Each structure stands twice: as structure tokens, then as C-alpha cells.
Amino acid sequence: MAFEELHDNWLTVYKLNERGEEVWHYNAEIIENGANFVCVRALFVGRRDEVRSGFMVFRRGDVMTEWFFNDRWYNIFRVQDGANGALKGFYCNITRPAQLSEEVVTAEDLALDVLVAPNGEITLLDEEEFEAMPLSAEDRTQAWAAVEQLKQRVVARTPPFDELGH
């Protein structure tokens, strides 16, 4: 496969804060493009070898399958152990709807995170950080609605949560 062909299957993901300022960016391989979403795969290459968030420990080399939506106030990261492929869980960021193009995804993070363990247990993170943000009432309403939508999807085992245990 020529480099140009491989390059066509990649894009750059930009994580922005609530003010639209870049916090982090990385390259990801496009897995699927839908009408209102893109699914990509990336390796965790954090600034540290290991990052703990709630019950989940991210390690350099972990595999992230990520869904970004331009019509939903969240994204979903499926986290697999880079060494053995085991499902670590799902990390869902509450965000404004993503901006999607052929080469770039941008998502404005609103601090709230929904972690889903492999057994389906749900943990909400960073409520205090979210409450301290200077957000509009509409943004707050949409963010809390997104948390509820994710919880409902997990309980119903709607894809990609259909592989969770009980």
C-alpha cells in the first residue's frame, strides 16, 4: 500500500476546552464514516506512561476505538489493553457536538465524563470541574441530557455497549 493511500485513512483529532482552545491533538485511523459520525482508532500516547481516571488506568499503547458525533453532546472511547486486547471499559466525554471534516475532528470538552466498566457499572467523573465552568444554561442542560442518554444506552446495551457483561 502506498503512503498516499494509507494517509487518506487518517485524520487529526483535536481536543478543545470549553472555550474552544486546543488542549491536545493526535492522529487516528478512520474506521468508519457515517452521516453524523466518524469512528477512528488510535493508540494512547499520553504525556505519561500511565494515567489513572476513576477505575480506569490508561497505559501507553492502549488501543482506543473512538466515536465522534456531530449531532450528540458526547463522544465514546472504547479502551482496550494494548498488551492483550482485553476490554478495559468505555470512557465517554461530554462535549459540544463534534465538528467533522475529512481530515479533522474537533471536540470541545465540557469536563463531565462517564466511565463504563466491562461489567456495565457506570461512574460519573469531574462534576465539580463542570459546575465551575462558565457555561450557558443551554450547554448545561444539553450536557446533563447527554449523561442520561449515555446511561440509557449502557443499560439497553446499545452498540457499542452491546459487548458489556451484566
Residue ranges and their predicted role:
Residues N33-A35, D81-N84, A117-E121:
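Short acidic-glycine loop/turn motifs at beta-strand connectors
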Residues A2, A28-E29, S101-E103, L112:
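A generic local secondary-structure boundary/capping motif
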Residues F37-V38, Y74, I122:
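Hydrophobic residues embedded in beta-strands of well-ordered beta-sheets
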Residues G54-Q99, V105:
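Phosphate/ribose-recognition catalytic cores of enzymes acting on nucleotide-derived substrates
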Residues Q149-H166:
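Cysteine/selenocysteine-centered motifs that mediate thiol-based redox chemistry or coordinate metal-sulfur cofactors
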